[in-house]
Amino acid sequence: PMQAHTNPWYLVLSSYWFASSFKWFLILLVLLPARVAELVPEAERATRLGLLFALGAVMALIGPPIWGYISDRVGRRMPFLVLGAVLTAGALLWMAYAGSYWQLVVAYLLLQIADDMATGPYSALIPDLTARRERGVASGWLGTLQVGGQVTAGAVGFLLANLQWQFLLIALLNLVAAGMVLSLIREVPGLKPQRRELWESLLAPWRSADFRWVWLTRFLVMLAQYMVQTYLQYYLADVVETFQAFGQTLATEAFQAVALLGLLISLGAAVSAVPAGRLSDQHGRKPIIYVAGVGLAVLMLPILLLPRYDVLIVLALVFGLLYGAYLAVDWALVSDVLPNPQAHATDMGIWQTSIVLPQVLAGSFGAMLDVFNRQSPGLGYTVLFLIAGMCFVLGTILVRQIRSAR
């Protein structure tokens, strides 16, 4: 095993998060839409894709807490990572070569189950293995690797035209990352198996007021983030319209323009995550969350008032820096307030729902957007981004209520 708690150790500890976010970025953005388009008539495309997304979202809500619970019951993490990673690779190959839409559905559901099996227990490793004074750094590395996975996936999606090769690459990366974690990280020896029943375990963390506040604040910030992210491409197409900066035309289509902004946000986040985590170990979690959250809220105004692509490029970078700091410190914050050391995987699985639920809910703002845009062009985006700004502010201010972290 590696020397614990050096930078390389943190890097390997979170390497499966790199593989996981690489996988989901390509699957949700590129591969699922493309495979559905190959397998169903054009008129049914959006409906069939929506069905897949909905099924996946429901499973992503219930899967991690349940696999986390099983992992806590057994008192082990790594066996789930191994089995989950192997099944993930199998499901990806099946998705790549599925001959019908329903085969694709089953393969995708298998992928969800396999992913939850691996990442539910895996998410307990930071609270399991790191002391409170180093969780900021550990979470910072996690944030950097998650974002790095997205950047790498974006590059691969851009450069590698063959869809089957993309699936194979994701499968390979999953196995390599799981192998790294397995060979170089030792899980907590003799973790006492959890004895509570499933319902009792799923309800237990909610009895802690701090856990409720951590869940709610994360939920609000993520809801704001996904409200912006989900409709940004349409905002670029409808309001910004031309994509010039520094005398150059950088993109001709809105989807290229949004990909570039996404890349800049990710780069900003990758830069800020580890330093922010380190600062939070020294000076406390809350000050950094206050700065990042208020900053994200304030950014909503220039996005609305100056709808020019060159301005958005700069704002995307700033957004990324703040968002990376928030992500890093938030994971450390929840690790600090988990009530029961024997239930880390269950509790982290429940906390993860505060990230999945906003993704699902963000889709429901589309109708409101259309209604307001019909009244006056662009009005919908103003309303949407202002609501997002309010969620950023609320999700930041309410962190004050968390008592057991500073």
For each predicted feature, which ranges?
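Multi-pass alpha-helical transporter architecture, strongest
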Residues: 96, 176-186, 386-406
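Central cavity-lining transmembrane alpha-helices of secondary-active solute carriers
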Residues: 50-69, 260-275
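C-terminal ends and interior cores of transmembrane alpha-helices
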Residues: 83-99, 294-307
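Cytoplasmic membrane-interface "Motif A"-like loop-to-helix N-cap segments
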Residues: 71-85, 282-293
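Juxtamembrane intracellular "pre-TM" segments in multi-pass secondary transporters
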Residues: 1-7, 187-216, 242
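Glycine-rich segments within core transmembrane alpha-helices of 12-TM secondary carriers
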Residues: 56-61, 136-158, 352-363
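Helix-loop boundary and gating motifs at the non-cytosolic
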Residues: 2-56, 212-213, 217, 221-246
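A membrane-interface helix-boundary motif in multi-pass transporters
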Residues: 77-78, 159-173, 367-391
